[in-house]
Amino acid sequence: MTRAWFTACLLLALTITGTSSNAAGATKAASGPDAVLGIWVPDAAPRQLLTVERKPPPLNAAAAKLYAARKRQFAAGDRSYDPTTWCAGPGMPRAMTMPVAFEIRRDGNHLAFIHGWYRWFRAVDLGGPDVNDPPLPLTMGFPVGRWEGDTLVIRTVGLTDATVMDANGLPHSDLLVLTERLRVLPDGRLEDRMTVEDPDTFTRPWETMLTFHRDATARVPDDVCPDRLAAGEPAEPPVATRREAAPPPPAIQAVPSAAPAPRLTGIWEPKTFGFMVTGAPLSKAGQEIVDRNAAAMAGGRIMQTAWVSCRPGAVSTMTMPREKIVILQSPDEITLLFEMPRMVRRIRMNATHPATLKPGYVGDSVGRWEGGTLVVDTIGFNGFAELDARGQPTSPQLHTVERFTPAADGSIDIEVTITDPEYYEQPFTIKRSWKKSASRHPFEYDCMENPRQEDFENAYYVRERYRPVCMRVEGEGMTLSKMVCGKPEE
């Protein structure tokens, strides 16, 4: 842990929520329900949640004892009670207390919070009744929203008790019901007033409040937590979204359309799923990698790819998407939220690629409509992704062109043309298809939830980057298992 990071955390570790001073750059409040949409930056990143009366939460005796022990751990520099320290999901309301920007987007009855920490998002159903009997507990639960005038009310149930509510480790049970009331204040800030109900943890319901402000320079990054841990950086970064904001993307160039674009909005799922991409015209270099991977697996080794190491690139969502995909569509951006692998892809419509790009896992995607087909061109990959479970490689030269065409049966037919001269002799095309899902919510995929030591004892790493940073080590006798993090070489 660096001294600079520690100092930043001390500045952020405010123990009182809901600061009331006006944030720099605050804008006048917009009107209507959609005033809550956009990118927001926390006014403070509270280490400890307090009630709106600035008092400690009304914990019962057992929960108070546990919370006190966790605060002592925090003071001693041990945060192993917090899953975010090994890049597992933050849960709620922990995600809203983190010192990173987030964006609220809406398309019809589909609303999403896109968080700036490790690709987490919340998909909120605005069109149905409350969920009262969740099928299983999830990291982000099952949020259902509604509008009360200009206030967005979100009720979330089904939150797993494996997460904590604040950085000090405030506990909760899986009976937690969290009701948020989000509204834009007259000074332009966003207020999130939360009612907490959990009879197994608290003696009564209580309220807390967080506030956020807009910042024209803020961006929601494509954050990859394991990469930061591997570099010796903290899992929870200090507020850097303003100081180190990326330059804005190129201005969108309006292109007149002869007919309205098809609507892709909704929740989708693959018609079929396969772990293999067949018939790829591998170059000599590509074939050598595939043969080396095959030999390792034939020898009984377990292959660790980018997907398995929780670093899946956008190309993985093109070739091997699993489970649900949420699509939010607007004239200037189409946003794809993938359940597995968990990822947010942004397609900037009628735009151009920047002249210079910092390579990343998701690349830079620009789209256009050709009649009823959405054409997406993506470059700027970092080369740390595989096409399939055999480890067919990609390089930074990877260039993909996707064509999404609505079919007569209501599904979406997809063609993906892949060009990568380092590993493939010529461009080739694969076909996929998505169908409408009956689900109201995606189930999140928390890849880093429980990496166990035995999972890596006979591992073969396609790339050194994929070595684990954190793993759960089983204790002996009465010693409980614990999560241990360190640099991959350790």
Model-derived features: where do they sit?
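Positively charged n-region of N-terminal signal peptides that target proteins for export
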Residues: 1-4
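PEST-like low-complexity, intrinsically disordered acidic/proline/serine-rich tracts
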Residues: 24-490
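Bacterial N-terminal signal peptides
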Residues: 7-18
